């Protein structure tokens, strides 16, 4: 026989379960924190991962130089990238052994070139701005956007900087401090030999004796 305390506890539990939808009122709980939105272009790590991890076999074959496009069995017959209806592996492509030939390079470049484009700066101007050891290029007659000033003054500056450059490029600090490169410190003048000094002393002694 069930006691009255157990019956009261069970009834209270049923009442709480019945009132729970009314308390929530059918509305979901608000999110605790707003989700952080990633940038439109993505970070460098995400771009590199997109290059290294293609989504499908089609993109894999387009990005990998060693693997040709996938051809199902029975399609294409003697296609250069297939061998008896099967996809040629990387060993056949790299060694030249087999019935298929090496496919042409993709238009977008290899994986290494795509990763280097992500990591390296876009232009020489941004590279010179980020590198403290290399200054901006000084070119005679430059200044197409703002008039460029006097051309003779630009030529004088270019002649002045001829001793500070190496094959048209500015020498870095290492070349100046260690004398490595095409600009070297001039050799010191040779020291006077002892022969003229001895002749002068002999002449002075002979004049005193006379």
UniProtKB/Swiss-Prot annotation:
PROSITE patterns: NATRIURETIC_PEPTIDE. It comes from the Eukaryota. Expressed by the venom gland. One of its GO terms (molecular function) is toxin activity. Residues 83-99 are annotated as: Natriuretic peptide domain 1. Keywords: Disulfide bond, Hypotensive agent, Secreted, Signal, Toxin, Vasoactive, Vasodilator. It is found in: Secreted. Residues 122-134, 156-176 have a biased composition (Basic and acidic residues). Residues 140-150 have a biased composition (Gly residues). Residues 201-210 have a biased composition (Polar residues). Disulfide bonds join 83-99, 166-182. Residues 122-210 are annotated as: Disordered. GO terms for cellular component: extracellular region. Residues 1-26 form the signal peptide. Natriuretic peptide that dose-dependently induces the rapid relaxation of rat aortic strips phenylephrine-precontracted. Acts by stimulating cGMP production in a dose-dependent manner (by probably activating NPR1 and/or NPR2). May also show potent hypotensive effects. Belongs to the natriuretic peptide family. This is Natriuretic peptide Oh-NP.
């Amino acid at each position: 026989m069930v006691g009255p305390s157990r019956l009261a506890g069970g009834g209270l539990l049923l009442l709480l379960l019945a009132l729970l939808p009314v308390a929530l009122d059918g509305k979901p709980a608000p999110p605790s924190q707003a989700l952080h939105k990633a940038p439109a272009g993505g970070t460098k790590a995400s771009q590199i991962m997109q290059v290294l991890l293609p989504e499908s076999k089609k993109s894999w074959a387009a990005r990998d130089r060693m693997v040709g496009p996938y051809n199902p069995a029975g399609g294409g017959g003697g296609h250069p990238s297939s061998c008896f209806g099967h996809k040629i592996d990387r060993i056949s492509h790299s060694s030249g052994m087999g019935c298929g030939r090496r496919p042409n390079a993709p238009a977008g470049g290899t994986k290494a070139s795509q990763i280097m484009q992500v990591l390296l700066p876009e232009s020489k101007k941004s590279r010179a701005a980020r590198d403290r050891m290399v200054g901006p290029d000084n070119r005679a007659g430059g200044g197409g956007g703002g008039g460029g000033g006097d051309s003779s003054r630009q030529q004088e500056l270019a002649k002045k900087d001829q001793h500070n450059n190496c094959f048209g490029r500015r020498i870095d600090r290492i070349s100046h401090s260690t004398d490595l490169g095409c600009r070297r410190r001039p050799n010191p003048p040779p020291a006077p030999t002892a022969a003229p000094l001895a002749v002068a002393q002999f002449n002075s002694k002979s004049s005193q004796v006379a």
